[in-house]
Amino acid sequence: MALTLQDVEHVARLARLRLSPAELEKMRDQLSNILDHFQMLQQIDVSAVPPTAQVTDLVNVLREDEIRPSLPHEQALANAPEQQDGMFRVRAIFEEE
């Protein structure tokens, strides 16, 4: 699957990456190769293979919640493109009723 430079620029923008023109070309080739491999995998007939969610029989080992120091507020917001009242500001994705 051949990606365009615009596709790669879009993905880079979503990931907040600044790529040079040479890096965009390199990423386009690499991402196109990855998508080609996925297309090959999609052609494999797995209808006779039973669905499997987990193969090791491991179970979750949970611990009690405990309050511990976390990332400082300023550091957590350092790379946020928009902030408001000390919180991340993001576009609304739900319609108000």
Swiss-Prot record:
PANTHER family, per the entry: GLUTAMYL-TRNA(GLN) AMIDOTRANSFERASE SUBUNIT C, MITOCHONDRIAL
GO BP terms, alphabetized: glutaminyl-tRNAGln biosynthesis via transamidation; regulation of translational fidelity; translation
Cross-referenced SUPFAM superfamilies: Glu-tRNAGln amidotransferase C subunit
Broad class of enzyme this protein falls into: ligase
Entry keyword annotation includes Nucleotide-binding: yes
Catalytic function, reaction form: L-glutamyl-tRNA(Gln) + L-glutamine + ATP + H2O = L-glutaminyl-tRNA(Gln) + L-glutamate + ADP + phosphate + H(+); L-aspartyl-tRNA(Asn) + L-glutamine + ATP + H2O = L-asparaginyl-tRNA(Asn) + L-glutamate + ADP + phosphate + 2 H(+)
Entry's Gene Ontology molecular function annotations: asparaginyl-tRNA synthase (glutamine-hydrolyzing) activity; ATP binding; glutaminyl-tRNA synthase (glutamine-hydrolyzing) activity
EC number: 6.3.5.-
Protein name, UniProt field: Aspartyl/glutamyl-tRNA(Asn/Gln) amidotransferase subunit C
Gene name tied to this protein: gatC
Protein family per UniProt: Belongs to the GatC family.
